[in-house]
Amino acid sequence: MSNFLTVGFWFCERLYHSLVMVKKRSDCTIYQITVMNGDLEKLLYGNHRIYEMNGCLNVEACENEDQQILKLNIAEALSKLLRIPLKNVRQSGGS
């Protein structure tokens, strides 16, 4: 069963919004992100999932630094909204 959330997040000093589809599976919960901005949606393309495992949100490292910063900003907002800890993976020197 899928539910939907709306999440506001900051990126480059501007507030944006995303639609998040929540898919619960037996082994994890998947948060599939759609950014409500065409340019940012293109930036996130191919790397738009955040996984909740073992009670934490996990964000995989991205090759593109801007994509990593965007995904982490969305994940941080989602973490605050859901009150689920975020596993910190800021490996590319993000903001």
Predicted regions and their residues:
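Short, surface-exposed, low-complexity cationic segments
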Residues: K24-N37
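Negatively charged, low-complexity tracts enriched in Asp/Glu with abundant Ser/Thr
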Residues: M1-S26
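Short, cysteine-centered beta-strand-loop-beta hairpins and adjacent loop/turn segments enriched
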Residues: R14-Y16, D39-L44
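Residue-level recognition of conserved beta-strand positions in structured domain cores
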Residues: V20, I33-V35, A61
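Acidic, low-complexity intrinsically disordered segments
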Residues: E41-S95
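A generic structural signal for beta-strand entry/edge sites
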Residues: F4, C28-I30, N54-N58
